[in-house]
């Protein structure tokens, strides 16, 4: 099982991501508005949110007039997402599925894999299978958007020496029971597989400051290099239209590879089906 398969994680997912993505290193301000604009621009023949989690993008789109489908590998994530949609009186199609082989039974003009969804595929075989599956689900000229980040050698070098119990504090949030929870993680990096793996530790505290629960949850992600992504896109029937750097409209100049050096934010790929 992975981090996102656990009931306790799914029920608090948006709570701790809201904190994480507002930290300086993980700035994701405006990400929902960003995907709404993409949906307005490219979603005329339907939108699907792949790796939708508990609905941060999917529900935001629906509340702003874009009714999309949603799918996630985690049944727990789908369950929480469906409950949140029902609480908002939103009638959405949400189903469990693996992005490498799910069949939605229809095609779309926009496929969204937001935030780190694509990076949870642990090897190139699954990445290729997923990209080809997204291609099959798109109408001619349809758009796939997904995220990667620039692997950073200094961080990689540090993580290559990380031991399973070398926990570092990540954040603190308030869970769905009103309890303070501190999150620590210990992430190691394997340069031969490009895999980041390790554990997230969740410590829950009572009102007196006593730790009353501790849970360890595993997580595995694969780093994908920028030029590797260009080759994967080409191999799977896509052309790179744009690479946004963050959610404020900044874009790389695709005719000048050195333009990428100006940014430290995530790469948000806009891929067009050939």
Predicted feature residues:
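Conserved class I S-adenosyl-L-methionine
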Residues: 1-45
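SAM-dependent methyltransferase
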Residues: 146-230
């Amino acid at each position: 099982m992975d981090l996102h398969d656990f009931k306790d994680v799914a029920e608090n997912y948006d709570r701790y991501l809201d904190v994480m993505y507002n930290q300086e290193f993980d700035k994701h301000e405006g990400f929902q508005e960003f995907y709404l604009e993409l949906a307005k621009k490219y979603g005329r023949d339907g939108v699907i949110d792949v790796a939708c989690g508990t609905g941060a993008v999917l529900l935001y789109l629906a509340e702003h007039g874009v009714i999309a489908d949603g799918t996630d590998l985690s049944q727990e994530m789908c369950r929480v997402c469906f409950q949140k949609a029902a609480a908002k009186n939103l009638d959405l199609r949400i189903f469990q599925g693996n992005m490498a082989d799910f069949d939605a039974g229809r095609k779309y003009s926009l496929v969204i894999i937001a935030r780190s969804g694509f990076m949870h595929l642990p090897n190139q075989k699954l990445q290729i299978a997923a990209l080809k599956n997204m291609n099959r689900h798109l109408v001619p000229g349809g758009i796939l958007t997904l995220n990667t980040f620039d692997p950073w050698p200094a961080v990689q070098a540090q993580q290559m020496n990380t031991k399973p119990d070398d926990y570092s504090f990540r954040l603190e949030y308030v869970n769905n029971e009103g309890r303070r929870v501190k999150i620590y993680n210990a992430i190691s990096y394997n340069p031969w597989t490009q895999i980041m793996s390790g554990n997230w530790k969740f410590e829950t505290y009572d009102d007196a400051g006593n730790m009353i629960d501790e849970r360890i949850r595993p997580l595995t992600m694969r780093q994908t290099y920028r030029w590797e992504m260009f080759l994967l896109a080409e191999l799977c029937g896509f052309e790179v239209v744009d690479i946004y750097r963050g959610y404020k409209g900044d874009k790389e100049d695709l005719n000048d590879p050195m333009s990428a050096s100006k940014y430290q934010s995530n790469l948000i790929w806009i891929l067009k089906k050939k």
